[in-house]
């Protein structure tokens, strides 16, 4: 007898594999085009990317095209010709071509920034497109930096754009940052924030920092004038378990657009000396109530380890070790449980699924609504940690023979939940599904949605 469900799962898996192959082909073809362009220009592509030589000779006048293109900002009293020339001769480095970096780059290029550097180690995915507005469906699988450059050059072909399709780290940060006038931190992860802060302090570069999560955003400028640096405000990194990224907490695309656009504005103000730069202050945006708050933050810390008169840190360190987390926005897989407390999705599917058991999905209700396994019961991790689940499952918990299986999106929160319940009921058989729903899609049912 033909198993139609298995055939459909295999069909979907093959289509997904073909899409991945096409994306990889697009990426390889783009790399080939870049290499051929570099060869045609008589330069080695790696040298073009890595070069720390000075930027081209400053321009002393605007062209007719400049005047026509930028006329609406040229007529601003505090901007004018000199402001446009400063912008034309400026160089800005954007770290992270995601939800913040895309709108920031778009507005800087549109305004006439002469030289732009783009850093991103990652590739475009469909889950990026709702907020990373420079990328497109047909460029999924391509380097984010390269994808952004294509879109930006369509907007303004006069801008010189240099791509760094790699992870910025302690080994390359000083070399990459040195040629630029201003740096935008659009990375939105803690380890990279400390890295960029320290490098910018050592190189005396202003750092325009933005962040966005859920419906909220923040913006400030570090290391500008007599203002504080990031370490002045946060001398010690937060514990890893207290940090939430947009992959877990979610974010509304328009919020990243607002913060990214304001980062571009602050960069322009720094470059041309316009207005009151957001240094020594923090802008907090609440998208749910659409309220902006502008609060004053502490001044420079006299004993700051980086920006004080006698700094303790004079060279870049291992920031992943310092922060206890990776310098990316990817989820770090936890390893909290013993092997006998973990259950592979294939084993669950083949053996346990048909037997009596209790399957608890510890994701938030909004995520449970997106998709769920049959017969799973939604018990958010927050309910487990505050023990409010005990009343709901008192009878099941009395039965020590009833297996309890916990799952989540990627297999991290379920481990935390297993630890907590096991401490309460050590005699019970309580296990988590390794890899969560992502593993279920990859190993059992390719038609199950991934988010």
Curated annotation (Swiss-Prot):
Lineage: Eukaryota, Metazoa, Ecdysozoa, Arthropoda, Hexapoda
Cited Pfam families: Rhodanese (PF00581), ThiF (PF00899)
Protein name: Adenylyltransferase and sulfurtransferase MOCS3-2
Nucleotide-binding found in the keyword field: yes
Source organism per UniProt: Drosophila pseudoobscura pseudoobscura (Fruit fly)
Keyword line: ATP-binding, Cytoplasm, Metal-binding, Molybdenum cofactor biosynthesis, Multifunctional enzyme, Nucleotide-binding, Phosphoprotein, Transferase, tRNA processing, Zinc
Job description of the protein: Plays a central role in 2-thiolation of mcm(5)S(2)U at tRNA wobble positions of cytosolic tRNA(Lys), tRNA(Glu) and tRNA(Gln). Also essential during biosynthesis of the molybdenum cofactor. Acts by mediating the C-terminal thiocarboxylation of sulfur carriers URM1 and MOCS2A. Its N-terminus first activates URM1 and MOCS2A as acyl-adenylates (-COAMP), then the persulfide sulfur on the catalytic cysteine is transferred to URM1 and MOCS2A to form thiocarboxylation (-COSH) of their C-terminus.
Compartments reported by the entry: Cytoplasm
Major place of residence: cytoplasm
Source domain of life: Eukaryota
Acidic residues: bias regions: 43-52
Region (Disordered) location: 42-62
Gene3D superfamilies per UniProt: NAD(P)-binding Rossmann-like Domain, Rhodanese-like domain
GO aspect biological process, one term: Mo-molybdopterin cofactor biosynthetic process
GO cellular component: cytosol
């Amino acid at each position: 007898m033909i198993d139609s469900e298995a055939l459909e799962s295999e069909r979907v898996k093959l289509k997904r594999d073909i899409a991945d192959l096409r994306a990889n082909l697009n990426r390889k073809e783009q790399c080939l085009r870049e290499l051929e362009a570099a060869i045609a220009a008589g330069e080695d592509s790696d040298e073009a990317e890595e070069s720390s030589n000075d930027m081209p000779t400053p321009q002393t006048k605007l062209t007719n095209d400049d005047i026509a293109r930028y006329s609406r900002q040229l007529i601003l009293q505090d901007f004018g010709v000199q402001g446009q020339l400063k912008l034309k001769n400026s160089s800005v480095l954007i770290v992270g071509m995601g939800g913040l970096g895309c709108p920031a780059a778009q507005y800087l290029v549109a305004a006439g920034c002469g030289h732009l550097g783009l850093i991103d180690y990652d590739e475009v995915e469909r889950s990026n497109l709702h907020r990373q507005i420079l990328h497109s469906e047909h460029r999924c699988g391509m380097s984010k930096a390269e994808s952004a450059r294509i879109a930006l050059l369509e907007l303004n072909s006069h801008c010189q754009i240099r791509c760094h399709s790699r992870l910025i780290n302690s080994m390359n940060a000083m070399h990459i940052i040195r040629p630029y006038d201003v740096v935008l931190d659009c990375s939105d992860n803690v380890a990279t924030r400390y890295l960029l802060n320290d490098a910018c302090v050592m190189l005396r570069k202003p750092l325009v920092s933005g962040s966005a999560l859920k419906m909220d955003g923040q913006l400030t400028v570090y290391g500008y004038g007599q203002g504080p640096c990031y370490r002045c405000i946060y001398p010690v990194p937060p514990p890893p378990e207290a940090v939430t990224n947009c992959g877990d907490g979610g974010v509304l695309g328009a919020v990243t657009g607002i913060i990214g656009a304001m980062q571009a504005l602050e960069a322009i103000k720094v470059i041309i000396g316009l207005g009151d730069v957001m240094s020594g202050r923090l802008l907090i945006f609440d998208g749910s109530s659409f309220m902006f708050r502008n609060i004053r933050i502490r001044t420079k810390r006299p004993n700051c380890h980086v920006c004080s008169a006698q700094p303790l840190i004079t060279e870049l360190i291992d920031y992943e070790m310092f922060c206890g987390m990776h310098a990316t926005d990817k989820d770090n897989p936890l390893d909290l449980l013993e092997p006998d407390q973990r259950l592979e999705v294939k084993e669950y599917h083949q053996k346990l699924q048909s037997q009596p058991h209790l399957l608890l999905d510890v994701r938030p209700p909004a995520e449970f609504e997106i998709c769920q396994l049959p017969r799973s019961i939604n018990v958010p991790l927050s309910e487990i940690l505050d023990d409010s689940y005990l009343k709901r499952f008192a009878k099941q918990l009395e039965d020590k023979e009833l297996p309890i299986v916990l799952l989540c999106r990627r297999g991290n929160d379920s481990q935390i939940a297993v630890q907590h319940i096991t401490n309460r009921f050590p005699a019970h058989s309580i296990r988590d599904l390794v890899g969560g729903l992502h593993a279920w899609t990859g190993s059992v049912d390719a038609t199950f949605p991934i988010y």
